[in-house]
Amino acid sequence: WRMIWEHECCVIAVLTRLTEKKKVKCAQYWSETDNKSSKYGEITVKLRETSSCGDYVRRQFELTKNNMTREVVQFQFIAWPDHGIPVTTSSLFRFHKAVVFSQPHTAGPIVV
């Protein structure tokens, strides 16, 4: 979260599920409960909203540090099959479009 804050990132793209064939592929660095806050050093992270969008999940976060607040959105692609590739590219293109269109022109880089 410190890197997100320091580089003024507004968008995070996650291309994997948390587990694949019962093996951890991505550490869950957010709360599962909407409106629950977690503290990471000087940064407080609150999950504001979770939305299921078919092939991906959209999460809206509020980051607070030193009385300053920023919004960050995370997109997690969940349609990637275990140990394989998607049958078609359409779901991945929809995911990419959602990620790119959510990126403000003045923001830092997209974190993948």
Curated annotation (Swiss-Prot):
Identify the PROSITE patterns for this entry.
Answer: TYR_PHOSPHATASE_PTP
Keyword match Hydrolase: yes
Q: Which GO terms describe its molecular function?
A: protein tyrosine phosphatase activity
Identify the EC number(s). Answer: 3.1.3.48
Outline the extent of the Tyrosine-protein phosphatase domain: 1-112
Provide the catalytic activity annotation. Answer: O-phospho-L-tyrosyl-[protein] + H2O = L-tyrosyl-[protein] + phosphate
Q: Cite the entry's keywords alphabetically.
A: Hydrolase, Protein phosphatase
Q: Name one Pfam family in it.
A: Y_phosphatase
Keyword match Membrane: no
- Gene3D superfamilies attached here? Protein tyrosine phosphatase superfamily
Q: Which domain of life is it from?
A: Eukaryota
In this chain, substrate is annotated as bound at: D82
By sequence similarity, the record places it as follows: Belongs to the protein-tyrosine phosphatase family.
Return the protein name.
Answer: Tyrosine-protein phosphatase 17
Organism in which the protein naturally occurs: Styela plicata (Wrinkled sea squirt)
